[in-house]
Amino acid sequence: SIPAPAQLYCELICRSDKLIAATDAVYPDRAELAKDVSKVYRELILDLYKHGARDIKLDDCTWGVLVNDSFWHAFDEGHLKREEILQLYKEINENALVDLPEDLRITTHICRGNYDSTWASEGGYGPAAPYVFKEKGVEAFYLEFDDDRSGDFAPLAEVPADKVVVLGLVTSKKPELEDPEALKARIKEAGQYHPLATTALSTQCGFASTEEGNHLTDEE
């Protein structure tokens, strides 16, 4: 699991005024920055493959923020509309995945924050669905759906039938277990929008994505 190319690009142009200034000093042309991020990531992925990696997951927080109406503009470059940013991030990711080995599996996880049993972003996948779910080179999408802040399943209709949707219905933020029948019902509901034959179940995220971890004991 590695940060997605679009995630790195976003960090370089959004994280802080100091970092933005340092980035602009080297890359006054953002298009060149995007191009080089994709190029370096492709080289990294091929090197990981050379050393034995056959399944690489791109951890991407950008989409979760861009669907959050309360602060998506924090990722704005000052002159682009949300749709233009979504298209840009899609292209950055796709350009890193060109002409990869056929036996290398690329997946992506849309992370919405997972630390101290809390989260960072909310909002349905709808605004990003026509972009992220159409990314070329990605075989599976790990999606958080453990509570209402992720919206409904309707955006899954944008995922091609041959791509795998991994439903993150099991929370990793608290110890209480989900009701099996409730999980079955939600999976059936998701099946209205994406074939169950290419649908899987998982936790919504990891159990300790940062050093703070979540409010869980080892036993839990």
Q: What kind of region is each of these model predictions?
A:
Residues S1-E220:
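Domain-level signal for soluble alpha/beta catalytic cores
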